[in-house]
Amino acid sequence: MRIVLQKVSEASVTVGSAVVSQIKHGYMLLVGIGTDDKLEDIDKLSKKILTFRGFDDDAGYGWKRNISEVDGEILCVSQFTLMARTSKGTKPDFHLAQRGELANELYGQFMDKLKAGLGDDKVQNGVFGAMMSCKLTNEGPVTIIFDSKA
C-alpha cells in the first residue's frame, strides 16, 4: 500500500462538472492498494497517517502536531497508478495494483479506520474508479510518501 500525503490549505475533487468532496486545512491523500496488501497494511498506514506530526505548534515549531490536534480534515483519493512499475520500457506496468472489487473493499476499510480515528465529518472521499479532477493548495509544500512495505 502506498500513500502520497500532501499538506493542504484546501483541496477538492470534481467528477464531471460536480464537486463531490472538499476540505479546508488538512491532508489530501492519494491511496494506492497493491495485490499483496492485507488488513495489516491498512491498519499500519491508517495509524501512521492519524498520528503523523505534520503541523507546527502554536509557537511555530514544525512537525509537532497531528491532524486531530489541529482540527484538520482528510480528503482521500483512490489512485491505482501509485502501484505502477516503470523499470522497464516507456509504458507503466500496473500488474501490482489490486483489481477493482478487492481494492474497493480494502480502500473502504482504510476510510473506515480514518473516520473512526478522526470523525466521520472530518474525512472526505473521491469516487472510487472514477475519472476525477483534483485541485489542491499544497502548504510548504509538504509532500510525504508512505509505503506499508518499507
From Swiss-Prot:
Its EC number is 3.1.1.96. It is found in: Cytoplasm. It is an enzyme of class 3 (hydrolase). One of its GO terms (cellular component) is cytoplasm. It catalyses: glycyl-tRNA(Ala) + H2O = tRNA(Ala) + glycine + H(+); a D-aminoacyl-tRNA + H2O = a tRNA + a D-alpha-amino acid + H(+). The keyword Cytoplasm applies. It holds the Pfam family Tyr_Deacylase. One of its GO terms (molecular function) is D-tyrosyl-tRNA(Tyr) deacylase activity. Keywords: Cytoplasm, Hydrolase, RNA-binding, tRNA-binding. A motif (Gly-cisPro motif, important for rejection of L-amino acids) lies at residues 140-141. The keyword Transferase does not apply. An aminoacyl-tRNA editing enzyme that deacylates mischarged D-aminoacyl-tRNAs. Also deacylates mischarged glycyl-tRNA(Ala), protecting cells against glycine mischarging by AlaRS. Acts via tRNA-based rather than protein-based catalysis; rejects L-amino acids rather than detecting D-amino acids in the active site. By recycling D-aminoacyl-tRNA to D-amino acids and free tRNA molecules, this enzyme counteracts the toxicity associated with the formation of D-aminoacyl-tRNA entities in vivo and helps enforce protein L-homochirality. Homodimer. NCBIfam families: D-aminoacyl-tRNA deacylase (TIGR00256). PANTHER family: D-AMINOACYL-TRNA DEACYLASE 1 (PTHR10472:SF5), D-TYROSYL-TRNA TYR DEACYLASE (PTHR10472). Belongs to the DTD family. A Gly-cisPro motif from one monomer fits into the active site of the other monomer to allow specific chiral rejection of L-amino acids. This is D-aminoacyl-tRNA deacylase. It comes from Kluyveromyces lactis (strain ATCC 8585 / CBS 2359 / DSM 70799 / NBRC 1267 / NRRL Y-1140 / WM37). The lineage of its organism: Eukaryota, Fungi, Dikarya, Ascomycota, Saccharomycotina.
